[in-house]
């Protein structure tokens, strides 16, 4: 039937050879409404960059309401601030103080992981949370330094600049990297390009995070064993070589203290995981361990000097660091590269954590707003002696379990850090480095997700392979290259899906007009004279030749099967195009060429249910006209019914 007709035919049921007549209505396949090129471009841009239609809430509103909605959109704190009360404040104060007890020791620990002065970790737990509380859309995200971004920054910068021999330059590069991370993150949000981070697939992140966790854990052997001279490399082989080559530096006092507190921290973590109501045990244990270990070192300082400690930490607010940003020189490219990579990782972690807890409380986290909030807080942080920060899963989990209601919990946490910076810094003088190593170890062990990796193995072997590439790349090559390898494998997977799309043969489920894959439904049966194929992807220049060759191969194989079984001659190939969401000029040419080659073999090509834009392009390219009256149908059932009826009327077998 043509796309402009609509008629009813009588036909013999395709499921049997009886003469039973059934009435099947043959529907027309309509062209989409005509649109100008500008209308099409506008819709396409809207679908790509504005899938959430952010301007919808402003329609049919007064100017006053639009201004209010605009402020709420830019500053989410205005959305819930007017309804804030003492009951909410009580919950936020409790949760804020709880996460502060975790953020203070973690901030010091993660700064050392990034090869930065410990005080920078505390600075980074003060300014960024305040900015996020105003700009962020998550109620439960607890902001501060995180292990993965700290590790990546430390490993990338230390490859070119020594954090000990050239500490000032290293610090400048750290702040500059943070600035570029923020610029990159905010730009993604402003330009609504957040889909770019989707190239970091779940499998990639599982493998990368696990590999980074192993590297971080091995790096902590320096602190746990009391080693003074240690490699600056991050790969597993040089790290383990350094551990055993410096056995003479191992300190039994440090080892005993480290194992003791590590056991306590792991035990409290296990208790809180088994009984979430006891979350406060694992939340308070790092700070309690810092206090107890500091007292122990202070009391035994005159008897042993084997246990190293932090030493002097300056009191006071974050000093300005705008003058330390490094915008010219030999290391600028390194700062930009480090900023982009740490920016991607921290952004991915922050958004994932925010959405996780938002789903538990049934509210929405706006991805683009989060990108801008995280980006702006890192840009501001780089000017106030902070390094890359984002939402931490461990702190956010504690924040959620502690009953946080709004982002005010971040303000409370920052206030607690402020008090620490102003008055309590001398108390950390004797804090042993081994306790910082134990805290980091406890935090990163949970990043190795065995169950997620096993699920990848069960569900998708290629995803599991991607996960392994990321994991071993981080372990044996380097952290950034390991990530790059995993992203490359993910891109190859995408290319394979695009260039080698799936096609399947359909058959009829007896007693119905339903056609489904012969490979999935055993009861489905072939229709004599027809080869029914479904294409399950767009048809582009990258796969058009492959699809053409694959369909011709299907036809050859079907004809060979018919000859072997003395079956009914193959007359028609039906292509179900329901899943073909788009087609380009190469795809159109491939369809036209396929029709021509099939005609030479006395085979008819029929298209079924091409969707809007595909239908429009088929019409404009004259392919529908070339297919003729019986070359286009709405459903496979209608195509089989109409063609079978026509053959029967013409006396064809």
Swiss-Prot record:
GO terms for molecular function: secondary active sulfate transmembrane transporter activity; symporter activity. The chain crosses the membrane at residues 93-113, 116-136, 141-161, 168-188, 195-215, 248-268, 280-300, 332-352, 371-391, 408-428, 434-454, 472-492. Residues 520-643 form the STAS domain. GO terms for biological process: phosphate ion transport. CDD domains: STAS_SulP_like_sulfate_transporter (cd07042). Residues 114-115, 162-167, 216-247, 301-331, 392-407, 455-471 are extracellular. It is found in: Membrane. Residues 1-92, 137-140, 189-194, 269-279, 353-370, 429-433, 493-653 are cytoplasmic. GO terms for cellular component: plasma membrane; plasmodesma. InterPro entries: S04_transporter_CS, SLC26A/SulP_dom, SLC26A/SulP_fam, STAS_dom, STAS_dom_sf. The keyword Heme does not apply. H(+)/sulfate cotransporter that may play a role in the regulation of sulfate assimilation. PANTHER family: SULFATE TRANSPORTER. Belongs to the SLC26A/SulP transporter (TC 2.A.53) family. This is Probable sulfate transporter 3.4.
């Amino acid at each position: 039937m043509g796309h402009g007709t609509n008629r009813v035919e009588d036909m013999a049921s395709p499921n049997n050879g009886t003469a039973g007549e059934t009435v099947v209505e043959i529907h027309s396949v309509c062209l989409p409404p005509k649109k100008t090129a500008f209308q099409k471009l506008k819709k396409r841009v809207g679908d790509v960059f504005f899938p959430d239609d952010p301007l919808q809430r402003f329609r049919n509103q007064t100017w006053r309401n639009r201004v209010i909605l605009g402020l709420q959109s830019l500053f989410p704190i205005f959305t819930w601030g007017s309804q804030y009360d003492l009951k909410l404040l009580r919950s936020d104060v409790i949760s804020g103080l709880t996460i502060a007890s975790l953020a203070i020791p973690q901030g010091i620990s993660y700064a050392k992981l990034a090869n930065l002065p410990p005080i920078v970790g505390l600075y980074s737990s003060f300014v960024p949370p305040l900015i996020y509380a105003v700009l962020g859309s998550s109620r439960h995200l607890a902001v501060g330094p995180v292990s993965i971004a700290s590790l990546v920054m430390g490993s990338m910068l230390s490859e070119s600049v020594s954090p000990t021999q050239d500490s000032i330059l290293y610090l400048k590069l750290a702040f500059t990297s943070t600035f570029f991370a923020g610029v990159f993150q905010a730009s993604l949000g402003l330009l609504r390009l957040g889909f770019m981070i989707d190239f970091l697939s779940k499998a990639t992140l599982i493998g990368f995070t696990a590999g980074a966790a192993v590297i971080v854990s091995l790096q902590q052997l320096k602190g746990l064993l009391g080693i003074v001279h240690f490699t600056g490399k991050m790969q597993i082989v040089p790290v383990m070589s350094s551990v055993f080559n410096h056995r003479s530096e191992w300190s039994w006092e440090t080892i005993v203290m480290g194992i003791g507190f590590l056991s306590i921290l792991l035990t409290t973590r296990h208790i809180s995981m088994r009984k979430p109501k006891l979350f406060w045990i694992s939340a308070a244990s790092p700070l309690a361990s810092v206090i107890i270990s500091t007292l122990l070192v202070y009391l035994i300082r005159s008897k042993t000097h084997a246990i190293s400690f932090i030493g002097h930490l300056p009191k006071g607010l974050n000093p300005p660091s705008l003058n330390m940003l490094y915008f010219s020189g030999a290391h600028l490219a390194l700062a930009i590269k480090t900023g982009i990579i740490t920016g991607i990782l921290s952004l991915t972690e922050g958004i994932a954590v925010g959405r996780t807890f938002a789903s538990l409380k049934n509210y929405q986290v706006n991805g683009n707003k989060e990108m801008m909030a995280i980006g702006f807080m890192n840009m501001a942080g780089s000017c106030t002696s902070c390094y890359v920060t984002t939402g931490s899963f461990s702190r956010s989990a504690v924040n959620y379990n502690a009953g946080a209601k709004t982002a005010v919990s971040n303000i409370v946490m920052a206030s607690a850090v402020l008090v620490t910076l102003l008055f309590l810094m001398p108390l950390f003088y004797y804090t042993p480095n081994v306790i910082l190593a134990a805290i980091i170890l406890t935090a990163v062990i949970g990043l190795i997700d065995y169950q997620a990796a096993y699920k990848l193995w069960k569900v998708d072997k290629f995803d599991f392979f991607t996960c392994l590439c990321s994991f071993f790349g981080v372990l044996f090559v380097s952290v950034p290259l390991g990530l790059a390898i995993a992203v490359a494998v993910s891109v190859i997977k995408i290319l394979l899906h695009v260039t080698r799309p799936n096609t399947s043969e359909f058959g009829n489920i007896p007693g119905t007009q339903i056609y489904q894959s012969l490979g999935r439904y055993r009861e489905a049966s072939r229709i004599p004279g027809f080869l029914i194929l479904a294409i399950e992807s767009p048809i582009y220049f990258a796969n058009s030749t492959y699809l053409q060759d694959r369909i011709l191969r299907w036809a050859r194989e079907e004809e060979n099967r018919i000859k072997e079984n003395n079956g009914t001659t193959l007359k028609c190939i039906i292509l179900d195009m329901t899943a073909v969401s788009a087609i380009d000029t190469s795809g159109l040419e491939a369809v036209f060429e396929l029709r021509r080659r099939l005609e030479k073999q006395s085979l008819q090509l029929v298209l079924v249910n091409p969707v809007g834009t595909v239908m429009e392009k088929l019409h404009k390219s004259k392919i529908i006209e070339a297919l003729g009256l019986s070359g286009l149908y709405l459903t496979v059932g209608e195509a089989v019914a109409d063609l079978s009826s026509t053959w029967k009327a013409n006396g064809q077998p």
